[in-house]
Amino acid sequence: MVPWLGPDDPFPPVERALGANSGAPGLLAASGDLLPSRLIDAYRRGIFPWYSDGQPVLWWSPDPRMILRPAEFKVSPSLRKTLRRVLRDDAWEIRVDHDFAAVMRACAQAPRRGQRGTWITADVVEAYSSLHRVGDAHSIETWFEGRRVGGLYGVSFGKMFFGESMFAEVTDASKMALAALVGHLRRHEIEMIDCQQNTSHLASLGGREIARKAFIAHVRASVEAPPIPWLFDKTVLLEIVAPAA
């Protein structure tokens, strides 16, 4: 049975999450709150919230866990060509934390295959915006001719980045933001991005699954490192692909 957490109740050990043969593998607990303090504690333990509007807050720690190592980021020939164009063309920008809440709302509105509605409700936007205001959550945004056309957001502690969601209004705009994030993380020797659950899209970009035990061990060590700066522009794409000669 999945435990219900009161406001002062701690998370159970992640090993108690429901197993692969259950109807909800990885489900660890449920609660009625999404307080910033609860969110911070969750991420530092390798736990994340995911639920539908009208449900209680559901907390997850799946096994295996989908991750992307910045060193293993895959750049297709077409994306490489796009990134070179972005580097040359002043109409393209990468902005960091320009409008965090707007990125979340755009992610909420993005259509997802096989998914109705969104879990990114107004309450979720406010909870993550609280983390953003204290420097624990960030948005990486792709802009073209002064308009935001893609981006992503996630949570960062120490040398660990926890990806949450992304959106694109033009082709490859979310991949541009991800490439910029990967370039920034490479510069700061960050070894892992949490991607939560396996998708073919993430796998095509170099994501892979690892055992939860290994993931949790990495998180525990990484979140205690000093925080990295979150100020960069599209020149971080040079970490991914050199501009055309």
Curated annotation (Swiss-Prot):
It comes from Paraburkholderia xenovorans (strain LB400). It catalyses: N-terminal L-lysyl-[protein] + L-leucyl-tRNA(Leu) = N-terminal L-leucyl-L-lysyl-[protein] + tRNA(Leu) + H(+); N-terminal L-arginyl-[protein] + L-leucyl-tRNA(Leu) = N-terminal L-leucyl-L-arginyl-[protein] + tRNA(Leu) + H(+); L-phenylalanyl-tRNA(Phe) + an N-terminal L-alpha-aminoacyl-[protein] = an N-terminal L-phenylalanyl-L-alpha-aminoacyl-[protein] + tRNA(Phe). This is Leucyl/phenylalanyl-tRNA--protein transferase. It holds the Pfam family Leu_Phe_trans. GO terms for biological process: protein catabolic process. It comes from the Bacteria. It is found in: Cytoplasm. PANTHER family: LEUCYL/PHENYLALANYL-TRNA--PROTEIN TRANSFERASE (PTHR30098), LEUCYL_PHENYLALANYL-TRNA--PROTEIN TRANSFERASE (PTHR30098:SF2). Its main location: cytoplasm. One of its GO terms (cellular component) is cytoplasm. Its EC number is 2.3.2.6. Belongs to the L/F-transferase family. Keywords: Acyltransferase, Cytoplasm, Transferase.
